[in-house]
Regions:
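Feature activates predominantly on carbohydrate-active enzymes
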Residues: 95-301, 315, 320-321, 341, ...
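Flexible, acidic glycine-rich loops studded with aromatic residues
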Residues: 358, 367-526
C-alpha cells in the first residue's frame, strides 16, 4: 500500500493541469456552480458549529460536523437546541426532485438545503469534496464562497456486489457502502444466490444456506446502515438458472432426467429448477416471503439470465408434458408460466420485480425479448453489444430499464492488460477507465426515447473477486466515471476535467485504507 501511495503522489505531481481549487475534487461534477464575490468563511475552534436540525436530520448534521473536523483538525460540534450556528441545514420544499440540494458558502457560513434528507446527504458529500480539493484554503481553516445548485440526471446510480461467488462479511459490505456514498450512489444490489453459494438464511428451508451466509438480522443491519447513508439495498435471488446451490440442498427440484445426478456447489453448472415441479414454486415462494420483509426497497431482483433451457426443460419429460398441455412449441416459452407464478409471490409481498434483460439471441443481431416480460418488470441490460436493442424494445413494450452494459459497466472485467493475472482464462475483454467514462446511459437518443431509463449500474461479478480489497480495486476509479454518467448532465461532462478531479479522490480513498487501481496508462509520457 505504501509503495502504491507514493506512486500515486508522484503521478499526481506530473499532472500539470491540476489546479488546487475548490472544484478540483468534485466527483461527480455538479450540474450548476456559481462563484459569488466575497470573503472566505473561517472555521474557528470553539465557535464553528452545526445548527441543531430536526431529529430526522441529526445523522446528516453529525456527518457534516465530522467532515469539517477531520479535514481541518478544528473540532466542530452540534449547537444546543435553539441556538444559532454558522452551519445550517434544512428541507426546502421548493426544490424539485428527490435529490435536489443547494449548497451555499459565504463569509457568514454554510447553508445546505435539500428537497429531502437524501438530497441533504448528497450535498454533505459535495461539501467534503470541496474541502478535499481546495487544500490550501482547507489547511488555513477557511472555505471560499461558492453556490452549488445540483440534482442528478438519473434517479438510479447503482453498484452490485456478488457475495454468492465469494462471501463478504457484514463489515466489508458496510465498508463498501461507505465508499459508494461518497460519490452519490444510491442503490446497492446484493447478488445473494448462485451456483457457488446461497448466502441468506431461510428459516422455512434451512438446508439452503451455505456455510458462510448472512443471518436475517445481519441483512437487516446492512439495510439499516445503508439507509442512514440514503442507499437502497436490493436483494437478488437468481432463478431459474444459476440454481446449483438450491439443487444441492433440494435435489428433488431438478428436472426429471437429472434427479439422480449429484450436484456439487461451486462445480456443477447449467442446472435449473424444474418448471413443471410444484415443489419448485413452493420453495421459491417461501424464500420470497422471507426475503421481502428484510429489505425496505420496493424491488426484488429475480435474475432470469443465462437459463440453460436446452439442457434442462427441453429434455425433461415433465416439462415436455407441461409444454404439450399449454400448446407451446419451444421450451423457452415455459419462462412465461414460471415467472407468472413466481412474480405473484413478489406482488403479494408488495414488491416490484427486476430481471436481467434477455433477448432471442445472445449476440447481435437480436430482434425481440426471450419471452414476453410482464408489464410491471423493470429490466437491466447487460449483454455486450445488445444494449441499443434492449433500449428500443423496453421503450416499445413500456418497461423501465437500468443500464449495466457489459462493455462499459462490468467492473469484474480487467481495467488494463495483465490486470487479472491469476484469473485470465475467460478471455474477459478489457474495460478501461476512459471507455467506462464514454457511457451515455441515454445512448444519444432523443429525450422521449430515453425517458424510461432509470439510471446505471456497475456490476462486480465475483468469480475473481475474493475479498473487499479486490472489490474496491476493481471498482475505483471506474466507479467515479459511472457515477458521473448517472449524475452529471452530458453538457457538463468532460474527460480532461474528470482526470484532474479523479486524482484527489483516489488519494483520499487510499488514505482511508481503500484499495484502488492507479490508472498510469492515461498519463502521457514526457
Amino acid at each position: 500500500m505504501k509503495r502504491t501511495f507514493v506512486a500515486l503522489v508522484a503521478l499526481c505531481a506530473t499532472i500539470t493541469s491540476i489546479a488546487q481549487d475548490n472544484l478540483s475534487a468534485l466527483m461527480p461534477m455538479p450540474n450548476h456552480i456559481e462563484h459569488p464575490k466575497g470573503r472566505a468563511w473561517h472555521i474557528i475552534e470553539g465557535r464553528t458549529a452545526v445548527e441543531q436540525p430536526a431529529d430526522s436530520l441529526l445523522f446528516i448534521a453529525e456527518t457534516i460536523a465530522d467532515i469539517i473536523s477531520q479535514r481541518t483538525d478544528v473540532p466542530v460540534s452540534i449547537a444546543q437546541k435553539g441556538k444559532k450556528a454558522d452551519i445550517k441545514l434544512c428541507i426546502d420544499n421548493t426544490l424539485e426532485g428527490a435529490e435536489h440540494y443547494r449548497l451555499q458558502i459565504s463569509q457568514r457560513g454554510i447553508t445546505l438545503s435539500g428537497s429531502t434528507a437524501a438530497a441533504l446527504f448528497r450535498g454533505a458529500m459535495t461539501l467534503d469534496q470541496l474541502l478535499i480539493g481546495d487544500v490550501v484554503a482547507t489547511a488555513q481553516d477557511r472555505m471560499s464562497p461558492i453556490i452549488i445548485d445540483d440534482a442528478p440526471r438519473f434517479a438510479c446510480r447503482a453498484l452490485m456486489l456478488d457475495p454468492a461467488r465469494h462471501f463478504l462479511p457484514v463489515k466489508d459490505v458496510k465498508f463498501f457502502i461507505d465508499q459508494m456514498a461518497k460519490y452519490k450512489y444510491n442503490v446497492l444490489q446484493l447478488h445473494l444466490t448462485d451456483d457457488q453459494g446461497w448466502r441468506v438464511a431461510i428459516n422455512s428451508h434451512p438446508r439452503l444456506a451455505s456455510a458462510k451466509h448472512y443471518t436475517q438480522d445481519e441483512l437487516r443491519e446492512i439495510v439499516s446502515y445503508a439507509a442512514q447513508r440514503h442507499i437502497e439495498v436490493i436483494p437478488e435471488m437468481d432463478i431459474p438458472g444459476h440454481t446449483v446451490a438450491i439443487l444441492a440442498a433440494y435435489p428433488e427440484l431438478s428436472c426429471s432426467h437429472l434427479k439422480e445426478d449429484t450436484v456439487v456447489v461451486g462445480h456443477t453448472t447449467n442446472r435449473m429448477v424444474c418448471a413443471a415441479n410444484n415443489k419448485s414454486y413452493e420453495v421459491l415462494t417461501d424464500v420470497i416471503n422471507e426475503i421481502a420483509p428484510l429489505f425496505a426497497s420496493p424491488y426484488i431482483h429475480l435474475g432470469g439470465d443465462e437459463a440453460a433451457v436446452p439442457a434442462n426443460w427441453a429434455k425433461c419429460a415433465d416439462c415436455q408434458e407441461m409444454m404439450r398441455k399449454a400448446g407451446y412449441t419451444e421450451a423457452t416459452q415455459l419462462m412465461t408460466p414460471f415467472f407468472d407464478r413466481i412474480l405473484a409471490a413478489v406482488r403479494v409481498n408488495g414488491k416490484k420485480p427486476i430481471l436481467w434483460c434477455e433477448l432471442d439471441n445472445i449476440y447481435p443481431p437480436a430482434n425481440d425479448y426471450l419471452f414476453p416480460y410482464p408489464k410491471d418488470v423493470t429490466l437491466v441490460t447487460w449483454r455486450n453489444g445488445l444494449t441499443p436493442t434492449c433500449l428500443s424494445l423496453t421503450k416499445k413494450y413500456g418497461h423501465p430499464i437500468i443500464m449495466a452494459p457489459g462493455e462499459y459497466a462490468y467492473f469484474d472485467y480487467p481495467q488494463w492488460r495483465g490486470d487479472l493475472p491469476e484469473f485470465n482464462n475467460w478471455g474477459m475483454p478489457i474495460s478501461t477507465l476512459e471507455n467506462c467514462y464514454k457511457l451515455d446511459p441515454g445512448y444519444g437518443r432523443e429525450a422521449e426515447e430515453q425517458s424510461h431509463v432509470l439510471g446505471v449500474m456497475g456490476t462486480l461479478w465475483a468469480e475473481a473477486i475474493g475479498d473487499v480489497n479486490r472489490a474496491t480495486y476493481m471498482t475505483f476509479p471506474r466507479a467515479f466515471a459511472l457515477a458521473e454518467a448517472g449524475w452529471t448532465q452530458l453538457e457538463h461532462r468532460d474527460w480532461d476535467s474528470f482526470k484532474v478531479r479523479m486524482y484527489p479522490n483516489l488519494t483520499d480513498l487510499m488514505k482511508c485504507g481503500v484499495s484502488v487501481r492507479v490508472p498510469f496508462e492515461i498519463v502521457e509520457r514526457k
